């Protein structure tokens, strides 16, 4: 797992550690010291810790003017044992909401498992706080999406179908946002 790095193709235009509005502002990254692990397996040091034992993230891009962010996730999303949505919501999302972000894209190709909970308070709260924005998940494994459906996470997070963008790394973040916004608008019948 230590070889799986967060995407870095946009570091020339955005780095969360250099963004004063980011919850990870001022963070420094060692390329030689591995300090975090998931179930005893060390993970790459560029992933940001959110106080979860099994879920990490990386804010890849945020545009405060257009009010969107793209966040890559890594690990096991475990709401059953660790209430990971609480950690993600309180330690990352709330900071971005306070800065006016209302469009959230979660990249999930490195989320290896999801364990849901009947409690959906944090999802519901987040959904209500984006008001006329949206929350979307792209490139999550099909079995993760099925678990999301089982626990009704699809009430709050848009995912699946044409929201899976396997070529996302080759696109500029603005184009990803515009594409997803168009898809969501079409799904809601606004186009």
What is the predicted function of each stretch?
Residues 23-41, 61-75, 162-180:
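Charged, low-complexity, helix/coiled-coil-prone segments
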Residues 4-11, 143-191:
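A cross-taxonomic marker for long C-terminal extensions/tails that follow the last structured domain
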Residues 63-65, 96-99, 130:
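Flexible, charged surface loops at secondary-structure boundaries
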Residues 1-48:
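N-terminal catalytic cores of peptidoglycan-degrading enzymes
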Residues 42-88:
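STAS-typified acidic loop motif
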Residues 101-104, 108-152:
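Amphipathic alpha-helical interaction surfaces in cytosolic regulatory modules
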Residues 89-94, 123-126, 154-158:
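Short, low-complexity, polar/charged sequence segments that are solvent-exposed and flexible
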Residues 73-121:
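A contiguous binding-surface segment within folded domains or other stable secondary-structure elements
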């Amino acid at each position: 797992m230590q070889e799986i790095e967060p995407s870095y193709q946009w570091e020339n235009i955005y780095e969360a550690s250099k963004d004063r509005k980011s919850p990870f502002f001022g963070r420094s990254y060692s390329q030689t010291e591995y300090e975090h692990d998931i179930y005893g397996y060390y993970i790459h040091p560029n992933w940001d810790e959110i106080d979860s034992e099994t879920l990490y993230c990386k804010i890849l891009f945020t545009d405060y003017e257009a009010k969107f962010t793209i966040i890559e996730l890594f690990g096991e999303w475990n709401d059953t044992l660790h209430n990971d949505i609480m950690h993600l919501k309180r330690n990352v999302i709330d900071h971005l909401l306070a800065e006016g972000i209302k469009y959230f894209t979660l990249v999930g190709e490195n989320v290896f498992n999801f364990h849901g909970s009947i409690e959906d308070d944090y999802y519901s709260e987040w959904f209500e706080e984006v008001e006329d924005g949206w929350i979307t998940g792209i490139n999550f494994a099909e079995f993760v999406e099925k678990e999301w459906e089982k626990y009704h996470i699809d009430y709050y997070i848009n995912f699946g179908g044409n929201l899976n963008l396997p070529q996302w790394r080759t696109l500029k973040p603005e184009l990803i946002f515009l594409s997803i916004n168009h898809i969501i608008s079409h799904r809601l019948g606004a186009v």
